[in-house]
């Protein structure tokens, strides 16, 4: 059997054995982890499945935001299409998508280890360790307490915390690095294209996976260059990066990066300049030390890469845990990547040590010791896949069903796990959402904090009215809702009208808005004079804005969504008045009345204020595909053409991958 076929056979065996190990995942629908963020990915995929092919605007989350801003496209489209084509729920489709990639990811570790070492023993050890072990549990006690079955962290965070996009990206990462290693060492056009495609797939699944890719890819370039000492290595690396970006350009726009960076402080601790400086110094020391070693004697790329990958993931994760380093995002979420780096290094070290007879007893002892945590994991291997059987009794389902049936089209404010699951079954609008990094309106976190944490009902009601919210969902202390975000859930009692009470701790209150629609005819001068509140407790500015919105002209407005990207508004406007639409402003929104384009500006709360002419009009608003996305599609098309030309000129891909 040829080497390439043997490698493919090994990968196939690893994939199918891993599938057997996680078999319940492929049959799973909704699991018992009601606090898991996988709910938001399930909800997002359901929305996409029901509104294919590609809505440009997402009106149901965050008082409206760009659909592309919510999350990278791979998992959401993969889940939606599996659900649509297989005729299954998006929850089960999500678990199938993540399960298949998880199993492929273990095979990807094999291919990465084999590509780097040309040792099947190393590759098998790395794959087995990845499927069964988590070295980080030895050094991080809180993770050990959180993972009582001692299972691998990549599976634990997938099932316990819903890190589906992250682990899917990590699963592809092994293949991407293996292809990159081969493409950097020798001119192989087909492998270079494959590397670019796989790197793009990592980024298109998750940004923590992309962070790991950026780190590992940089170390890999350096390691390969130290071995071959050819400047062309850097050109090949640039080609891979260009291909990867080009394939992502249609969604990875400049504004996407800006919004994601802007919102990072809502979901992670900001980077510390001192921590970044430490990381840069460590990188400089690593480069200097390895360069000096390479000048004295020839070095091999693979061990240099392993040492670098292990060192820098340790600086990120262990540095965050033990020394409080904040380099980029929440570094502790890179624990599965740290496991990967350490496992690859351990497999290399054990195989290298085995070649020395006097070290073989030590290797045997270490392998036996590694079996210890495997026993509890295998004994409880089905524990992470427990299905929920109480869905009809859960507030996450009951509340959303009631609102869909009794207040269709209304914007509500859920919280906690109800917020996570709010759109898993119905197209109900909420002022919050499930992916804060995609939030366009920066007033929302201030408002939601005051509503849930503040003691004063009048301030909370003012914020609800300002956001165009018709109903607020308040889980009390006895609710089955998981997070209980309200510090004073009783503050609305006797102040707001109670319209739903399940007598199990979940109450829905009606917000006293003048008209139910998200649009208002307002006095232009009064609304323009309203200022943005300085903070959540700035009652003066808040109520001045609310007064301009709710106490304006007695002119009801009819609002009809004709799709996620289109709104028809019927309004009668008098001189000196304007139309307020409580949907987040974006320059890509266009308004027309009687065939004429109308100017749109944002108000103090980030909503759309339209300069409508006097008279009765039907004003049509349409969210156009932004110019940067159209340019991105052009770049992606050119990239695909270049990739096709490279593939056409390449030899057989199968032979190139293993030479």
What are these regions (language model features)?
Residues 3, 540-658:
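Active-site-proximal, structured, solvent-exposed surfaces of multi-pass membrane proteins
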Residues 3-5, 187, 227-239, 287-314, ...:
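Membrane-interface helix-loop-helix junctions at transmembrane boundaries of multi-pass membrane enzymes
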Residues 1-25, 124, 365, 638-659:
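Start-transfer (signal-anchor) and selected internal transmembrane alpha helices
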Residues 179-200, 230-239, 361:
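Short hydrophobic alpha-helices at membrane interfaces in multi-pass membrane enzymes
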Residues 212-242:
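Perimembrane helix-loop-helix junctions
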Residues 7, 20-180, 201-211, 382-391, ...:
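Active-site lumenal/periplasmic loops and adjacent helix-entry segments of GT-C-fold
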Residues 47-52, 85, 107, 167, ...:
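Extracytoplasmic
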Residues 242-245, 350-376, 659:
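Signature aromatic-anchored transmembrane alpha helix within multi-pass, membrane-resident enzymes
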């Amino acid at each position: 059997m040829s080497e390439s076929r043997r490698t493919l056979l090994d990968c196939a065996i690893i994939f199918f054995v891993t599938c057997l190990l996680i078999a319940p995942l492929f049959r799973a629908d909704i699991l018992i982890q009601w606090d898991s963020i996988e709910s938001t990915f399930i909800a997002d995929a359901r929305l996409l499945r029901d509104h294919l092919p590609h809505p440009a605007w997402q009106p149901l989350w965050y008082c409206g935001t760009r659909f592309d801003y919510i999350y990278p496209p791979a998992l959401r489209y993969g889940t939606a299409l599996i659900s649509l084509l297989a005729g299954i729920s998006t929850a089960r489709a999500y678990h199938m998508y993540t399960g298949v990639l998880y199993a492929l990811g273990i095979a990807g570790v094999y291919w990465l280890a084999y590509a780097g070492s040309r040792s099947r023993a190393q590759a098998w050890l790395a794959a087995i360790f990845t499927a069964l072990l988590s070295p980080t549990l030895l050094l991080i006690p809180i993770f050990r307490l959180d993972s009582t079955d001692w299972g691998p962290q990549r599976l634990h965070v997938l099932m316990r915390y819903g890190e589906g996009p992250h682990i899917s990206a990590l699963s592809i990462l092994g293949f991407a690095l293996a292809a990159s290693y081969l493409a950097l060492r020798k001119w192989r056009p087909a492998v270079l294209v494959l590397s670019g495609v796989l790197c793009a797939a990592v980024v298109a699944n998750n940004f923590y996976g992309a962070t790991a890719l950026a780190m590992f890819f940089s170390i890999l370039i350096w390691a390969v260059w130290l071995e071959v000492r050819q400047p062309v290595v850097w050109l090949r690396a640039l080609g891979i990066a260009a291909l990867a970006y080009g394939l992502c350009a249609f969604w990875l726009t400049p504004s996407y990066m800006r919004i994601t960076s802007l919102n990072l402080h809502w979901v992670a601790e900001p980077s510390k300049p001192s921590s970044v400086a430490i990381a840069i110094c460590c990188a400089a020391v690593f480069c200097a030390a390895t360069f000096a070693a390479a000048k004295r004697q020839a070095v091999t790329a693979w061990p240099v890469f392993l040492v670098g990958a292990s060192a820098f993931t340790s600086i990120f994760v262990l540095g965050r845990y033990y020394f409080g380093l904040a380099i980029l995002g929440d570094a502790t979420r890179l624990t599965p990547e740290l496991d990967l780096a350490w496992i690859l290094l351990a497999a290399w070290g054990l195989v290298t040590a085995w070649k020395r007879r006097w070290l073989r007893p030590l290797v045997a002892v270490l392998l036996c010791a590694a079996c210890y945590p495997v026993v509890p994991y295998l004994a409880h291997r089905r524990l992470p896949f427990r299905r929920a059987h109480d869905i009809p009794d859960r507030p996450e389902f009951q509340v959303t069903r009631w609102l869909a049936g009794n207040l269709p089209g209304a914007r509500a404010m859920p919280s906690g796990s109800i917020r996570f699951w709010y759109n898993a079954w119905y197209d109900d609008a909420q002022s919050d959402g499930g992916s804060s990094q995609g939030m366009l309106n920066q007033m929302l976190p201030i408002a939601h904090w005051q509503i849930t944490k503040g003691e004063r009902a009048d301030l909370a009601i003012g914020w609800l009215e300002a956001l165009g919210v018709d109903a607020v969902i308040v889980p009390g202390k006895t609710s089955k809702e998981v997070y209980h975000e309200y510090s004073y859930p009783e503050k609305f009692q006797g102040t707001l009208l109670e319209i739903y009470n399940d007598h199990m701790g979940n109450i829905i209150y009606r917000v006293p808005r003048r008209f139910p629609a998200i649009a208002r005819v307002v006095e232009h001068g009064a609304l323009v004079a309203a200022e943005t509140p300085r903070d959540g407790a700035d009652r003066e500015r808040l109520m001045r804005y609310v007064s301009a919105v709710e106490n304006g002209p007695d002119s009801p407005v009819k609002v009809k969504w004709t799709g996620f990207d289109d709104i028809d508004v019927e309004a009668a406007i008098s001189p000196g008045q304007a139309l307020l639409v409580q949907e987040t402003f974006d320059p890509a929104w266009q308004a027309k009345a009687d065939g004429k384009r109308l100017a749109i500006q944002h108000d103090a709360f980030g909503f759309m204020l339209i300069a409508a002419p006097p008279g009765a009009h039907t004003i049509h608003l349409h969210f156009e595909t932004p110019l940067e996305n159209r340019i991105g599609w052009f770049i992606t098309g050119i990239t695909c053409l270049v990739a096709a030309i490279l593939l056409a000129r390449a030899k057989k891909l199968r032979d190139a991958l293993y030479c």
